Amino acid sequence: MIEYKKRILANGLTVVVNRDKASKLAAVNILYKVGARNENPARTGFAHLFEHLMFRGTREIPNFDLPVQMACGDNNAFTNNDYTDFYITLPKDNIETALWLESDRMEGLDITPEKLEAEKRVVIEEFRQRYLNQPYGDQPMLLRALAYKVHPYRWATIGLTPDHIAGATLDDVQAFYRTHYHPSNAILSVSADFDEERMLDLAEKWFAPLADRTVTPQPIPREPQQEAPRRETVERDVPATTLSLAFHMGGRTSQDFYTADLVSDLLSGGDSSRLYKHLVQEQRLLASVNAYISGDIDPGLFVFTGQLLPGTAPEQAEAAFRAEIEALQSIPASDYEVEKVKNKFEANTLFGELNVMNKAMNLGFYEMLGDLQLINGEVAAYRAVTTGDILAFSRRTFRPGNCSTLIYKAKK
């Protein structure tokens, strides 16, 4: 059970704090409600670019990392399709260093032409190395583009093309900063061994003076329901052919999420899982196999993927996946299978609650979802999933017309 207190400052910043008496560290987390989904289709990759730019210093603090290091702390960040997260861990007595740094870059980021060009080069090189020049690098990008035709989930966090980053102007990025990086679009979450009211007062001290910006959010286009199967085959210079089947499913706050997460673990969570046992060990069709959910806020994807062994045709692998899907749709999962997966999730959740950084991140995440109480309710939500729910989800989701199939063939 994670206890917390919440306050919304006059400028719109949401603050959530948790007292952890067992830790000598403080975790300070800032979540900005901006990800790839908030980008202009003609200017993608900006949220990820800003993950880099936010470490380039402000007018008051030219070197962001130096004060963190002097305070014996550590910091990092990540960006996904739905949000951007910045976090700092440091000794609890130095907590105000983290609050000072985060409040300063929320308002005073110093974006110069030189800094912008330097980070553009870094991001473009990352794009090339991870997605264009690396084996299988463009596979997830191709699958997204196949499954989504309207929603901005059709591009990855890195963007649609490096040309969008190369063409970004100073005016473009300053406008993006003004639109998305301000108090009412952010959540500050803290876990440390301090009285909650004191932590809330410290948040007031450092963040209340910041002015908010009035911004009209752009609507996110809704992805139309897929009615017909989609297929794409590409050939690349890779060691082995891979096959991916992606099915649309509900978003993060839908009941679909819990059922789908259990199903994905039931299918591929370890050596005793169905897909590994049947397709890797017994039938020897695949070298590796996975089933996972994207976990996006808006309706996301349930993906089956496998790397084919030499001698396995894509048609064989696809037929094997279909057979596993049909079993899910027709034969109730055993109580033992389902209970094993539920126990694993509960254990992981309880273990994660021991870490101050996990708690700070999760407080921000659930507040962003709009249901902060869910931080203490997800175990019960997973526990409530029945074998009947798994059957119903599988029948509703794993339909041929709801499937996008990508065959990523190795050149002969």
Where is each model-derived feature located?
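An aromatic/glycine/proline-enriched structural segment found at the starts
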Residues: 5, 149-150, 154, 182-251, ...
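Buried hydrophobic packing residues in well-ordered domains
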Residues: 12, 30, 48, 86, ...
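M16/MPP (pitrilysin/insulinase) zinc-metallopeptidase core fold and M16-derived inactive scaffolds
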Residues: 27-89, 155-158, 270-285
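Histidine-acidic residue clusters that define the catalytic metal-binding segment
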Residues: 1-6, 144-186, 218-223, 349, ...
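A structural supersecondary motif
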Residues: 69-70, 165, 244-248, 267-308
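C-terminal regions of mature proteins
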Residues: 187-190, 307, 327-328, 332, ...
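M16/insulysin-pitrilysin zinc metalloprotease superfamily fold
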Residues: 57, 89-122, 294-352
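His/Glu-based metal-binding/catalytic segments typifying zinc-dependent metallopeptidases
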Residues: 20, 29-31, 145, 215-274, ...
